[in-house]
Amino acid sequence: MLYHENFDVIVVGGGHAGTEAALASARTGQKTLLLTHNIDTLGQMSCNPAIGGIGKGHLVKEVDAMGGLMAEAIDHAGIQFRTLNASKGPAVRATRAQADRALYKAYVRNALENAPNLTLFQQSVDDLIVEQDRVVGVVTQMGLKFHAKAVVLTVGTFLGGKIHIGMESSSGGRAGDPPSIALADRLRELPFRVDRLKTGTPPRIDARTVDFSVLEAQHGDNPTPVFSFMGKREHHPRQIPCFITHTNEQTHEVIRNNLDRSPMYAGVIEGIGPRYCPSIEDKVMRFADKNSHQIFIEPEGLTTHELYPNGISTSLPFDVQVQIVRSMKGFENAHIVRPGYAIEYDFFDPRDLKQTYETKFISGLFFAGQINGTTGYEEAAAQGLMAGLNASLYSQGKEGWSPRRDQAYMGVLIDDLSTMGTKEPYRMFTSRAEYRLLLREDNADLRLTEKARELGLIDDVRWARFNEKIENMETERQRLKSTWVNPNSAGIDELNKLLKTPMAREASGEDLLRRPEISYSQLTQLDAFAPALEDQQAAEQVEIQVKYDGYIKRQQEEIEKSLRHEHTKLPADLDYKDVKGLSNEVVAKLSEAKPESIGIASRISGITPAAISILLVHLKKHGLLKKGEEE
């Protein structure tokens, strides 16, 4: 049966990737349909109740800078906020927040239900409608057909999902939800490379059965950081602490004695798990010299007694889970509310994607989230926003867009995935970016909001606030540049107290701010340079831009050099066997990867600078280099 309406874009899945994809498409004015197997699970946090962290917080800020929802949602649902690496440089500082699951999910659902151009419908998708290597719609579980110009799949861990607790396994997309078997089978018929990954989650604990008096409390920052560039502290709900406990030798002994009952160690699970979020049994075996591991006890919300023990993800049998939990300090009488489990699922090799998240084999079909081999809510949200945007552009017959590696962590993410692929769940870190000093949390809006406005993602309110911030920054920098003091100026003694060496010559406010020992807030407390900006975001930018000016300029020069041939297009029908001078290995790798540009080709494993030079000579010889690329 054919549904009575056609759509521009269909998004399949209502998790963190799906919600951002649907909202991005709808914000750009496209008629969008979000299909989910259960409307009640929209925006659900399937694993840990937290958003952000090193690298991840950067992605959230970028999603926010492009009009996405995640930062706004966590500002309204966060019950503990912290700035990680606060004592380090601005490039690696990151925001992290504990979430109230119920508040977060409710905020996301409300945003989806009230978004113009967006329709929600509850049905699982079993099939794609493909005509001449182009997707034109989907078929649901009950045979209902929906037609659209573009389809975004954000199916999480549901494709062929299998849940493991001990040696028992069952089909499932996550605990309590059915898997997508028919869709997984259908996708395996298409020419994509497919493999299996696994992830896991810890048992949940009833807080009323825990002795908090023996645990170390971990409080959030005061004042609390804010995630969204439009956020305010008054949006935050009541703040509460987390707690810390540790595993011990007794815990480790329980695990070692029961490894024969672990599906991972017994060879039942084939999928590779996340390197940076290993199960407790994996940690005990891999780090055999450690007799203790730190476990963070995270509240799941303000209106529930459930606790999330971050650090003991496991697929061991339930009776062993009870022993593990009760071996830890403060948990001697703990009651498990939900058992931990591992889940195995299909993912598709992201090297089969273009940089727009469109698949190379099926036009108009986009993948985002764990289907691409990533792990984490933040990575999913970033992919979802970009896939939804590009599906919208595709449906309008416009050229797709994705940021470069030097423009955003979102650019690093898709570039890593589409050029190198992944054999294990991919997680974002600041160390993955070459230009970290430029890709800071604090300047995500300066990097991306203008482009997002051009693409139709930014509303008038956010645009006005962005321009106000830019104006405040420019005015303040000009004020500091043009305000001078000398050794004889009034109040100079107060200034000298802040300096390592007293002033010997005339200096501007900007000259003084470059000194490492003086901060913007200290400088603007002095009569000569008062008052400070009321706009704290603008003030932070002024300080960072002045203090790191030399380093920032150096990185920008490096980027300009590297960009010379970054966007030089490689014809889709180029036969690399016809390019004289390329080795058989290089020909094979380029033929398989089908890179869209010289920049992408240069980052494929095994492609040498010499091979890139040969390609450029070939392009020039055949008149395929644009003016300005030949120098």
Swiss-Prot record:
The subcellular location is: Cytoplasm
Q: Which GO terms describe its cellular component?
A: cytosol
Binding residues for NAD(+), per the UniProt record?
273-287
InterPro entries (UniProt xref): FAD/NAD-bd_sf, GIDA_C_N, MnmG, MnmG-rel, MnmG-rel_CS, MnmG_C, MnmG_C_subdom, MnmG_C_subdom_sf
Its keywords, alphabetically, are:
Cytoplasm, FAD, Flavoprotein, NAD, tRNA processing
Tree of life domain: Bacteria
Q: Which GO terms describe its biological process?
A: tRNA methylation; tRNA wobble uridine modification
Name any cofactors this protein relies on.
FAD
Gene3D superfamilies, alphabetized: FAD/NAD(P)-binding domain, GidA associated domain, C-terminal subdomain, tRNA uridine 5-carboxymethylaminomethyl modification enzyme MnmG/GidA
Recorded hits in Pfam families, A to Z, give:
GIDA (PF01134), GIDA_C_1st (PF21680), SAM_GIDA_C (PF13932)
What GO molecular function terms would the record report?
Answer: flavin adenine dinucleotide binding
Q: Which residues bind FAD?
A: G13, G14, G15, H16, A17, G18, V125, S180, Q370
Q: NCBIfam families from the entry?
A: mnmG_gidA (TIGR00136)
Q: What does this protein do?
A: NAD-binding protein involved in the addition of a carboxymethylaminomethyl (cmnm) group at the wobble position (U34) of certain tRNAs, forming tRNA-cmnm(5)s(2)U34.
Concerning its family, UniProt says: Belongs to the MnmG family.
Q: How does it assemble?
A: Homodimer. Heterotetramer of two MnmE and two MnmG subunits.
Indicate what this protein is called per its UniProt record.
Answer: tRNA uridine 5-carboxymethylaminomethyl modification enzyme MnmG
**The organism of origin for this protein:** Vibrio parahaemolyticus serotype O3:K6 (strain RIMD 2210633)
**Name of the gene encoding the protein in the UniProt record:** mnmG
